[in-house]
Amino acid sequence: MSWQTYVDEHLMCDIDGQGQQLAASAIVGHDGSVWAQSSSFPQLKPEEITGIMKDFDEPGHLAPTGLHLGGTKYMVIQGEAGAVIRGKKGSGGITIKKTGQALVFGIYEEPVTPGQCNMVVERLGDYLIDQGL
């Protein structure tokens, strides 16, 4: 299965059969190389990936400055140290799950809820971890 298939079928999927889906998603290597992304995913800046990776290594690193992705600033909210970073901006937000080799990104806007975004992103992330990826 290609990485694009994971994005198209497992991240940009219909959530809970409600006809809702994430606003954007991607699978990105720890080095910032994009493995696959939805057409709506923002253009990443190298320093944004560097900051995200540092927060996984040193939880709380992004809290004072916020999480920046594609030039958009998200307020960092509760996550799981070394595993998940979550951010909020207005009525939407972001979930980033770290696997052995990749970062799985999900960006949502209402009516999708933070919990739905977390579920979609973390489910794929956990699967990739189980596959040694």
Curated annotation (Swiss-Prot):
Intracellular or extracellular location(s): Cytoplasm, Cytoskeleton
Pfam families: Profilin (PF00235)
Family assignment from sequence similarity: Belongs to the profilin family.
Function: Binds to actin and affects the structure of the cytoskeleton. At high concentrations, profilin prevents the polymerization of actin, whereas it enhances it at low concentrations.
Complex formation: Occurs in many kinds of cells as a complex with monomeric actin in a 1:1 ratio.
Extra remark: The variability of the residues taking part of IgE-binding epitopes might be responsible of the difference in cross-reactivity among olive pollen cultivars, and between distantly related pollen species, leading to a variable range of allergy reactions among atopic patients.
Name used for this protein in its record: Profilin-4
UniProt organism field: Corylus avellana (European hazel)
Source taxonomy: Eukaryota, Viridiplantae, Streptophyta, Embryophyta, Tracheophyta
